From Swiss-Prot:
Similarity comment: family membership: Belongs to the SPT6 family.
Localization of this protein: Nucleus
Keyword Transferase: no
Record-given protein name: Suppressor of Ty 6 homolog
Stretches for region Disordered: 1-238
Pfam families assigned to the protein according to its UniProt record, in alphabetical order: HHH_7, HHH_9, HTH_44, S1, SH2_2, SPT6_acidic, Tex_central_region, YqgF
PROSITE patterns: S1 (PS50126)
Domain (SH2) ranges: 1300-1389
Name of the gene this protein is made from: emb-5
Species per Swiss-Prot/TrEMBL record: Caenorhabditis elegans
């Protein structure tokens, strides 16, 4: 609050009031603030990230480690109070506050979406993301947008208008005598960009929109300090006095608070948005997660080398070879080694050139511009995908450099603090030049993570002191000693820091090698071990202190300390990381939920049991399926270094480091042997307990990120396939415009028909012109009905088809598209084709019109979108779907770009099953790259974008532009009569800066023919081509030279003539022209000249692949998408549709004899179904027409139909294991059966099936993973069978009907839970688990011990009722009340008497012998005599043990006794009460039991666990220890 007060005082000090008018305290406060402003503050550049360790982890780690922490707590409280006393004396900047928060473990809680790296207790979490620059960047992405949005309603705003204008209203409303409130009014919209109010009116559709309503009258500066206001009153003598009074602080509601932020964002009204729109820099450069920054030549050289290594050469942990092909450098693949290095140098040079184009501010070119207009500079070595990869990795390089500079600066400052301060603690581990160089030359975030982790361990506790030392040094205040005292105790209450504070580090230094020396010995033995002359425990004795109370604790602390330091050494981490990743394996096992959930349709069905699979064998996105299943609780995932064979041979990771004897002294003395053992424990602790868990989590995150990247790449590839083809281009001829009312020659007319999934809804057709605007539409109610359907369906279908014919005859489309909704589309396509053919046969249309099946997904997304509803509010959904489908057939790019809107409808496209499981920002990045490529390749008609809303979104993907610049540009166009006559007007009229214009000019095309019709101004013909304005003169020169006319000729006329006769360009020597340009200093421009020549031949020729209707496998995938996926080996439910027959030749039929059945009837030998009493009837049947009841032929199988409309064939041999002549003897028509898919033929849309029980039971073993865990699978199978059997038995057991308060139909487990909540005197009677003619009685003896016995029933009237006679042992009872009163309650009473006895052992059972004996000894020390102790038996309920010392040797004897309904049985004697048993025991305890007299061999004691199977020891068994 002091900081806020100080700022408020500054504001007030500049408000124009004199010092005399201020209160005295206020003047003193301002003077003090001015003094503080004179001091120089040092900015801490420490990491602005949260510290990963938390206090809870440290407390757990500290448990049992130190002797007493009371003093430490008191110190901590003292520190806290000391800190609060000085909190207002120093003003820290944000980074200093972040740094202190980091080291005090004060941080905001973040939602963790990733596996946390659990090794470190003091590393910063974001920087520890291993090998995931992508993910790290995602987490760092500028919160630019978010911050700008947060700034929407806040921030100080300057004055608005003059002072006199502001006081005008006060003057008018003044009533003379009333006090005047003379308060400055700060308008909330003072700093709003010009035109923001108009934009807001457009967005919200409110003509009288007033931005004043968005902001409070009183801004933050207005009285922030003391919340006062000035009131001017008459002093009675003609003068005025000013009175300061507390102002009304009641917060006023604003219009801003009632509007969703997203609604304001739609218009890009924020100041930050306007700044992006106006700045002369590509918008994507400004919005990049790490913005593009200026770089010098040395940095670009280093970056180019780094990019070729990590972007194009560095491999992945998992197998991503197939997906990485698009990003590989084709120019150096499969080259001969003799030329490889030279080509690689050329590629590095090209990459550096690309970086110069991106990062040198005088260029600022986007990758697309470089690919099209700077081909020669990159020697045509880099593809467009390569350029984008360079751009993306430039972002990672900038992010890495930013992190690196922060850590380097922090280490440099710490070293300065070590060298110049008087803090001896800081000098213990000086930072060397090598440490700084390691940081400076770190190449990956992993390396930086390791360096930072080591720094945080060694110097993290010194950061507070360093900051205060820096401030004290620069301000000249002598407060350093005070700071040192105040921060003497560590604020980091973790195990390592406790060791440091108590001097344990000195003992760790006597182990022979420091952690740094150990890491340097990994490659070769550079350092010899310095052997300490004392034994380890003897040396530890010297460091015993209150916190470490004995030598064992000291030695353990030293081992932990050195192990921690070893685990943080970057070289050690690098070594372990490489080893771990090379050999890591993983195991997959389904959970109980997974076993029930994962069926044959699940992608992990054949991968759900995995054993010891190498991580490197994972492919593409495979691991993301495992991760998703793990998150859903379906499987358990375990990653380990050792394979199953390694575990069997004890070949663990740590052994690789121990076997090299890095930390071993080669001597055989007792001292050396003990020290070697201690050193091995250190290494084992560092590797096994600290690094392996860390590396396991790090590897998990790494392969998870690789899987997510694979999904993103597959989404990009799928999306590219949808926009890489052009729309339908008809072959125009002279008959195309022979009808009145048709558009001009060459204009396309596209029709689309969409039918709904609900058959009772109407279908719609729509026709669009070449601009995608609706020309006409058609409603067909009965389009989906069948032509030969029953009832009136045929007539209704004909009505709809007649409407379709009339529409086509009138509008004459060039092509018709039909949506692929389900399998019905193939039938409906035939209907449309027949209708078109009928029109053509009647000469009603001049040529056949093609009908195409089309992917319907994008059209359905558009149909459901808010944009669709806003643009076509009066059209039904199916018509809107047809409109989108027609535009997709016209040109897919504008329609897909149309989905990239504020609602992000583009993400509704189904591109990959796992696309929802990756970060949407990552998905947006790869999809935007593809749209930028294709939009710029096709070119953007800017006037069409201004005229038609469905084209508008294309403009944002133009090179150099973005959503903000595109919006701003369109507003400028609308202000200029909605027309751009030339590219030059983008600069003159729309005020585009030179850099943005250079990027976008070549990709913005002007339809010169249409523009010429609308304006009399000069229209540059080259503006309609891909020729960039910077090379217009070369194009004109080429046209003049090709025509061989004088240079003084009109170049525009020459261009026109060349475009009409492009063949004349063939004779032009472009190579010579290129050489001339090179001599004139323009550089190599041969590729550019050839591109210009191509454009003059055909302006903006579509470079995409021509439109192609989906067929074969692609069509099958689109059709199968409408239902449940069917794959080979799957079991699917299908309905028998018909029997399939094979025709029999008539000549062969004459020679076939009918079969004679047992009933004497004759049966057809072919169809096996027709019978007749005479052979002639069979002959007539065989020769008859099958459509009129004749023989259909020999049945060969059945035709099956599935829910998704597909059909399959199951031959006779696959219907049953036995021979089948007639399928109808095994199956019935229209009945559902399960079938197994043996073969899937996507080209023919056919399935080859089997319904044999043997096939249905077997899994397709060929589909199983190579590392399938058969042993675990069989074990789980047996477990599932056992559980199923128990469940079946439970369901079949008769439910008992017994009216008694103690009876419950529950299991033993449920009964024990109920008894835990009941009184000790209660018991539960329940059905017996083994027999229906029996009951079980259960009661609780003590914690974990329950007695249970069987009651036999006889004389039962019903199986579910209770028997009239109950028997336990040899005793009979008439009913349950008698059983409880005579048998159960006496034993409960005696057991309660024992368990409440003062000498009863309550903390365990008698099987826990050591605990019982310890309790006996404690009682002896407490009572001063030999006691006896009771304990209950866990193994044998209803039996107890009495433990006692029977002689002076303090040996303890344990004897069992048993409670019975009539008392207690002990040493083969019965006693009525416990007191009588104890009286007898006290007289005879010194006598050995009978069993010990017979045998001197002590008996074994029971332990808590499973009940013993054999032998059975009698209740009176005794033994002693």
């Amino acid at each position: 609050m002091d900081f806020i007060d100080n700022q408020a005082e500054e504001s007030d000090a500049s408000s124009g009031h004199s010092d005399d008018e201020e209160p005295q305290s206020k003047k003193m406060k301002m003077a003090k603030e001015k003094s503080k402003r004179k001091k120089k503050m040092v900015a801490s550049s420490d990491e602005d990230e949260d510290d990963d360790d938390d206090e809870e982890e440290n407390r757990k780690e500290m448990q049992g480690f130190i002797a007493d922490d009371d003093d430490e707590e008191e110190d901590a409280k003292s520190e806290k109070s000391e800190k609060s006393r000085h909190s207002g004396e120093d003003e820290l900047d944000d980074e200093d506050l972040d740094l202190i928060n980091e080291n005090y473990d004060i941080r905001e809680t973040k939602k963790q979406n990733r596996v946390q790296l659990g090794d470190s207790s003091d590393e910063d979490e974001p920087i520890r993301r291993p090998n995931h620059e992508d993910d790290d960047l995602l987490s760092e992405r500028g919160s630019d947008d978010g911050d700008r949005r947060k700034d929407r309603g806040r921030g100080d705003r300057g004055g608005y208008g003059s002072e006199s204008e502001r006081s005008e209203d006060d003057f008018i409303e003044d009533d003379g005598d009333a006090p005047r409130r003379h308060r400055k009014r700060h308008r909330g919209d003072e700093n709003l960009p010009e035109g923001a109010e108009d934009d807001a009116r457009d967005v919200f559709g409110v003509e009288d929109f007033n931005l004043d309503e968005f902001y409070d009258d009183d801004d933050g500066e207005d009285g922030l300090e003391d919340e006062e206001e000035e009131i001017i009153e008459d002093d009675g003598e003609g003068g005025e006095i000013k009175i300061r009074r507390k102002k009304d602080t009641t917060k006023k509601s604003t219009l801003l608070e009632s509007i969703e932020p997203s609604e304001i964002d739609r218009g890009f009204l924020l100041p930050g948005d306007k700044k992006i729109a106006k700045e002369d820099l590509p918008e994507r450069f400004q919005l990049r997660r790490t913005p593009v920054t200026e770089a010098d030549d040395d940095e670009l050289e280093s970056e180019a080398l780094w990019i070729i290594k990590y972007a194009f050469e560095e491999g992945t942990v998992t197998n991503q070879a197939d997906l990485d092909q698009d990003d590989k450098l084709d120019c150096i693949m499969n080259l001969d080694p003799s030329v490889y290095e030279d080509r690689k140098k050329a590629v590095i040079k090209s990459i550096k050139k690309v970086l110069q184009f991106i990062r040198v501010r005088s260029n600022s070119f986007e990758p697309t511009f470089i690919g099209f207009y700077r081909k020669e500079d990159i020697d045509n070595l880099l593809t467009m995908n390569n350029l984008w990869r360079v751009y993306d990795f430039d972002e990672k390089w900038c992010h890495l450099s930013e992190k690196k500079n922060k850590i380097y600066d922090l280490m440099r400052r710490m070293r300065e603090y070590q060298e110049l301060s008087d803090d001896l603690t800081a000098k213990r581990r000086p930072i060397s030049d090598a440490d700084l160089m390691d940081t400076k030359y770190a190449e990956t975030l992993e390396q930086l993570t390791d360096i930072h982790a080591n720094f945080q361990l060694l110097y993290g506790a010194l950061l507070d002191d360093m900051i205060r030392w820096e401030k004290g040094r620069l301000t000249g205040e002598e407060e350093e000693q005070e700071y040192r005292v105040k921060f003497k105790s560590s604020i980091r209450n973790d195990k390592y820091q406790m060791c440091v504070e108590n001097g344990i580090g000195e003992l760790a230094g006597r182990f022979g090698l420091t952690a740094k020396q150990f890491s340097e010995n990994l490659n070769w033995k550079k350092h010899d071990i310095e052997q300490d002359p004392m034994l380890p425990l003897e040396a530890a004795e010297e460091y015993v202190c209150p916190a470490f109370s004995d030598s064992d604790m000291v030695l353990n602390g030293a081992k932990f300390m050195l192990a921690k330091e070893i685990s943080r050494q970057p070289q050690v981490r690098h070594s372990v990381r490489q080893e771990f990743r090379q050999s890591a394996h993983f195991w997959i096992k389904p959970t109980k939920k997974g076993r029930d959930t994962i069926d044959q349709t699940h992608p992990l069905y054949d991968k759900r049991y995995i054993k010891s699979k190498p991580v490197r064998s994972l492919t593409a996105e495979e691991f993301l399926f495992y991760h998703k299943a793990k998150e859903d609780g379906l499987v358990d995932v375990l990653i380990m270094y050792e394979s199953e064979e390694d575990q069997d041979s004890n070949n663990y990771l740590v052994n690789k480091y121990l076997s090299d004897s890095i930390f071993q002294k080669d001597e055989y003395t007792e001292n050396v042997e003990q020290w070697n053992s201690v050193r091995d424990e250190c290494v084992n602790m560092a590797i096994t307990e600290m690094l392996v868990p860390y590396m396991r989590d790090e590897l998990y995150n790494t392969i998870l990120e690789e899987a997510k990247t694979a999904v993103a790449k597959k989404c990009r590839k799928e999306f590219a396939s949808r926009i890489s083809r052009s729309g339908y281009l008809p072959d125009f001829d002279n008959n195309d415009d022979d009808d009145d009312g048709m558009d001009q020659h060459g204009a396309r007319r596209i029709m689309a028909v969409c039918y709904p999934t609900e058959r009772d809804e109407a279908s719609f057709g729509v026709m669009v012109d070449e601009n995608g605007a609706i020309v006409d539409y058609l409603r067909m109610v009965h389009f989906t009905k069948r032509t030969f359907g029953g009832g009136n369906n045929g007539l209704r279908k004909a009505e709809s088809m007649d409407l379709f014919k009339k529409f086509v005859q009138r509008r004459k489309p060039h092509a018709i598209g039909l949506n692929i909704e389900d399998m019905e589309c193939t039938r409906l396509k035939r209907d449309l084709e027949e209708a078109v053919a009928d029109l053509f046969s009647q000469n009603l249309i001049y040529k056949p019109i093609p009908v195409f099946l089309m992917d319907n997904e994008a059209a359905k997304v558009y149909m459901r979108s808010n944009v669709s509803l806003a643009e076509n509010p009066d059209h039904p959904p199916t018509l809107r779907q047809a409109l989108s489908l027609a535009r997709l057939l016209l040109d897919p790019i504008p329609e897909y770009a149309h989905l990239w809107n504020i609602d992000e409808d583009i993400f509704c496209l189904s591109l990959h099953p796992l696309q929802r499981d990756i970060d949407q920002e990552q998905l947006a990045l790869v999809l935007s790259h593809e749209l930028v490529n294709k939009v710029n390749e096709e070119g953007v008609d800017i006037n069409k974008c201004a005229e038609f809303p469905h084209y508008t979104n294309m403009l944002q993907f133009t090179c150099g532009l973005g959503p903000r610049k595109a919006t701003d540009l369109l507003k400028s166009i609308k202000a200029n009569d909605n027309l751009i006559e030339s590219r030059s007007k983008l600069v003159v009229g729309c005020k585009l800066g030179p850099k943005v214009f250079m990027n976008c000019a070549g990709f913005i095309k002007i339809d010169t023919i249409k523009v010429s019709e609308k304006t009399d101004a000069y229209v540059e013909v080259l503006d309609g081509s891909r020729v960039h304005p910077e090379t217009y003169e070369w194009a004109r020169k080429m046209a003049v030279d090709a025509l061989e006319v004088d240079d003084s000729a009109d170049p525009t006329a020459a261009l026109q003539e060349i475009m009409e006769s492009p063949d004349r360009l063939r004779d032009l020597d472009l190579d010579a022209f290129a050489d001339e340009l090179s001599r004139q200093g323009f550089g190599e421009k041969k590729s550019t000249l050839y591109d210009i020549s191509s454009e003059l031949s055909a302006r903006y020729k579509d470079l995409r692949q021509p439109f192609q209707e989906p067929t074969g496998e692609l069509l099958y995938d689109l059709l199968a998408r409408s239902g449940k996926e069917i794959r080979e080996g799957a079991k699917v439910l299908g309905t028998v549709q018909s029997v399939q027959y094979r025709k029999v030749d008539k000549d062969a039929a004459d020679s076939m004899l009918p079969d004679v059945g047992e009933d004497g009837l004759f049966t057809c030998p072919c169809c096996k179904s027709f019978t007749s009493s005479a052979p002639g009837g069979i002959q007539e049947h065989m020769l008859g027409d099958s459509r009129q009841g004749g023989c259909p032929g020999t049945p060969v199988g059945i035709r099956v139909r599935f829910d998704n409309g597909m059909t399959g064939f199951c031959p006779n041999k696959n219907i049953s294991s036995s021979h089948v002549d007639n399928p109808l003897t095994r199956v019935k028509i229209n009945q559902p059966y399960y079938f197994k898919v043996l073969k899937l033929d996507k080209e023919r849309f056919s399935l080859f099936l089997s319904c044999k029980s043997s096939d249905l039971k077997e899994d397709d073993l060929s589909q199983r993973d190579q590392y399938w865990d058969e042993h675990q699978y069989q074990a789980d199978l047996e477990l599932m069978k056992s559980e199923s059997k128990k469940k079946t038995e439970a369901n079949t057991r008769v439910k008992r009907v017994i009216a008694h308060p103690n009876f419950h139909n529950v299991s033993y487990e449920a009964a024990t839970k109920m008894l835990d909540e009941m009184d000790w005197s209660e018991c539960i009677i329940r059905p017996s688990a083994n027999k229906d003619s029996g009951l079980s009685v259960t009661w609780k003896i003590c914690d974990r011990v329950y007695h249970n016995f069987f009651v036999k029933e006889s004389a039962k009237d019903q199986v579910f009722s209770i028997g009239r006679q109950l028997s336990v042992g040899g005793e009979d009872f008439e009913d349950l009340d008698e059983l409880i009163a005579r048998f159960v309650q006496p034993m409960i009473q005696i057991s309660h008497e024992i368990t409440t006895h003062k000498y009863f052992f309550p903390n365990g059972t008698c099987e826990e012998t050591e605990a019982v004996e310890q309790f006996v000894r404690e009682k002896k020390r407490e009572l001063g005599r030999s006691p006896y102790v009771f304990s209950a038996s866990y193994r044998q309920p209803c039996q107890f043990c009495i433990s006692y010392m029977f002689d002076n040797t303090e040996r303890i004897r344990h004897e069992y006794f048993k409670i019975v309904p009539h008392g207690v049985r002990f040493r083969h004697q019965n006693f009525d009460t416990l007191d009588r048993m104890m009286a007898w025991f006290k007289r005879h305890f010194h006598e050995p039991p009978i069993e010990l007299r017979r045998s001197a061999i002590p008996a074994p004691q029971y332990r808590v666990g499973a009940p013993p199977a054999a032998p059975y020891y009698p209740p009176q068994f005794v033994g002693y220890h």
